[in-house]
Regions:
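Juxtamembrane/disordered regions of integral membrane proteins
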Residues: 1-144
Length: 144
């Protein structure tokens, strides 16, 4: 669980700053607040997802070995990836809705786009981290 959360946080920090940059740069070209919120979210995803995949792969490329046989346990790895996709997909849906809604609201209250992106990311990340960990525990994603 610690490595999983560490990977999410590392990728989230990278996405956090790219979302703020994307929102601010988009605001120079157009004032559409909803599109600005969507651009910020997409900017985050363009950095966040690749970072998570890379850090997760590095941490797990030698994991899940069967100590008796000495080979990688393919069935366990596939089940673990399936559970990971479930936990992250559900949590990401909540993240995206929360992020876009709060970003849009902050822009309506005259926040700078980069500030709106950062504040909305913090709110959405709080919900995401709690939700992904609760779901992960329920579907037994984390093993001892």
């Amino acid at each position: 669980m610690v490595l999983f959360n560490r990977n999410l946080i590392i990728s989230g920090i990278a996405g956090y700053f790219s979302g703020a940059l994307g929102a601010q740069l988009y605001s120079m070209y157009d004032n559409n607040m909803l599109v600005n919120a969507i651009v910020a979210l997409l900017s985050e995803y363009c950095v966040d997802i690749p970072f998570f995949v890379i850090t997760f792969y590095i941490d797990n490329k030698y994991g899940h070995h069967d100590p008796i046989v000495g080979k990688k346990n393919q069935a366990f790895s596939k089940q673990n990836i399936k559970n990971l996709v479930i936990a992250i997909s559900v949590s990401e849906a909540f993240y995206a809705v929360t992020k876009i809604f709060t970003h849009y609201q902050f822009l309506h209250h005259a926040m700078e786009p980069y500030q709106a992106a950062m504040a909305s990311s913090l709110i959405a990340w709080t919900i995401f981290i709690v939700l992904v960990n609760v779901i992960g525990k329920k579907i037994k994603l984390f093993h001892k």
